[in-house]
From Swiss-Prot:
InterPro entries: CENP-X (IPR018552), Histone-fold (IPR009072). This is Centromere protein X. Belongs to the CENP-X/MHF2 family. It comes from Gallus gallus (Chicken). It comes from the Eukaryota. Heterodimer with CENPX, sometimes called MHF; this interaction stabilizes both partners. MHF heterodimers can assemble to form tetrameric structures. MHF also coassemble with CENPT-CENPW heterodimers at centromeres to form the tetrameric CENP-T-W-S-X complex. Forms a discrete complex with FANCM and CENPX, called FANCM-MHF; this interaction, probably mediated by direct binding between CENPS and FANCM, leads to synergistic activation of double-stranded DNA binding and strongly stimulates FANCM-mediated DNA remodeling. DNA-binding component of the Fanconi anemia (FA) core complex. Required for the normal activation of the FA pathway, leading to monoubiquitination of the FANCI-FANCD2 complex in response to DNA damage, cellular resistance to DNA cross-linking drugs, and prevention of chromosomal breakage. In complex with CENPS (MHF heterodimer), crucial cofactor for FANCM in both binding and ATP-dependent remodeling of DNA. Stabilizes FANCM. In complex with CENPS and FANCM (but not other FANC proteins), rapidly recruited to blocked forks and promotes gene conversion at blocked replication forks. CDD domains: HFD_CENP-X. Keywords: Cell cycle, Cell division, Centromere, Chromosome, DNA damage, DNA repair, DNA-binding, Kinetochore, Mitosis, Nucleus. GO terms for cellular component: FANCM-MHF complex; Fanconi anaemia nuclear complex; kinetochore. Its main location: nucleus. Changing K62A: Abolishes sequence-specific DNA binding. GO terms for molecular function: DNA binding; protein heterodimerization activity.
Length: 80
């Protein structure tokens, strides 16, 4: 199976960041956007991997949202 390289577009990351800016004049450096995009990509991949392991631990072949919800608290703590 060929692995497809994916990620978040800079525009998407900037919009996500702007949702939490208090000052509308706040600017984000292009390098910071690339770094945040990479962090989001790693976070999503790790969430998917942990959810898959959780499903396997429950002897299930399909990952469901409940598996993501079970691993999310520890995942967030690991990324802080």
């Amino acid at each position: 199976m060929e692995e497809r390289e994916g990620g978040f577009r800079k525009e998407t990351v900037e919009r996500l960041l702007r949702l939490h800016f208090r000052d509308g004049r706040t600017r984000v450096n292009g390098d910071a956007l690339l770094l945040m995009a990479e962090l989001l990509k790693v976070f999503v991949r790790e969430a998917a991997a942990r959810a898959a392991r959780q499903a396997q631990a429950e002897d299930l072949e399909k990952v469901d949202i409940e598996h993501v919800e079970k691993v999310l608290p520890q995942l967030l703590l690991d990324f802080v």
